[in-house]
Amino acid sequence: MYTKYKWLYLSIFFMLLDGIIKYGIRAYFQIGEVLYILPGINICYIENSGLAFGLFSEISIHYRGIFIWLIFFIIIIFIIFLFKCRLIYEHFAYSIVIGGSLGNLYDRIVCGKVLDYIDLYVGKYHWPVFNVADIEICVGMMILIIRGGWNMR
C-alpha cells in the first residue's frame, strides 16, 4: 500500500509547486499587471472566477459552491483510480491531475477565484491565460487519453 501513497505525495508536490508560484505572483504583481518574458509569453496576473479558461465566469455565486463540491467529488474519483491503476504512467498521470486539481481547488476555496498568470500569444491573438495547475491537469489527461489509461484492468 505504501507504493500507492507515494503517488499521493507526488500529487501534493505538484499542488505545492502551483501554490508557491501563485504565492510569488500575488506577492510581486498587481491584478492586471503584465510582465513581458519572451516573444509570445507574458506573465499576466488575473483572477478567474469561472472554470478552465474562464468558462462560466458569469455564473451566480450560489452555483460556485456546487462547482467546488463537484470538483472535490471528481478529485476523490481520481484518487480511487490512482489506487486501482497498475502502470507507472497511469500513476504519474493521475498524480499530476490530482495535484493540479487540488491547487486550483485550494485557490477557489480560499480566495474565491483561481489565479491565472501564463499568457501565450501570437501577434495580437492571445490564448486564455492559465496557470501551472492547468498544465498539470492537461498533461495528465493527455497521458491518460494517449496511453488509454481510462481502462481499469
Swiss-Prot record:
Catalysed reactions listed for this entry: Release of signal peptides from bacterial membrane prolipoproteins. Hydrolyzes -Xaa-Yaa-Zaa-|-(S,diacylglyceryl)Cys-, in which Xaa is hydrophobic (preferably Leu), and Yaa (Ala or Ser) and Zaa (Gly or Ala) have small, neutral side chains
Record protein name field: Lipoprotein signal peptidase
Family recorded in the similarity comment: Belongs to the peptidase A8 family.
A GO CC annotation given for this chain: plasma membrane
Compartment annotation: Cell inner membrane
Pathway: Protein modification; lipoprotein biosynthesis (signal peptide cleavage)
Transmembrane feature ranges: 5-25, 36-56, 65-85, 87-107, 126-146
Gene Ontology molecular functions: aspartic-type endopeptidase activity
Function: This protein specifically catalyzes the removal of signal peptides from prolipoproteins.
Keyword tags: Aspartyl protease, Cell inner membrane, Cell membrane, Hydrolase, Membrane, Protease, Transmembrane, Transmembrane helix
E.C. designation(s): 3.4.23.36
HAMAP family: LspA (MF_00161)
GO biological process: proteolysis
Domain of life assignment: Bacteria
Active site per database record: D116, D134
Membrane topology of this protein: Multi-pass membrane protein
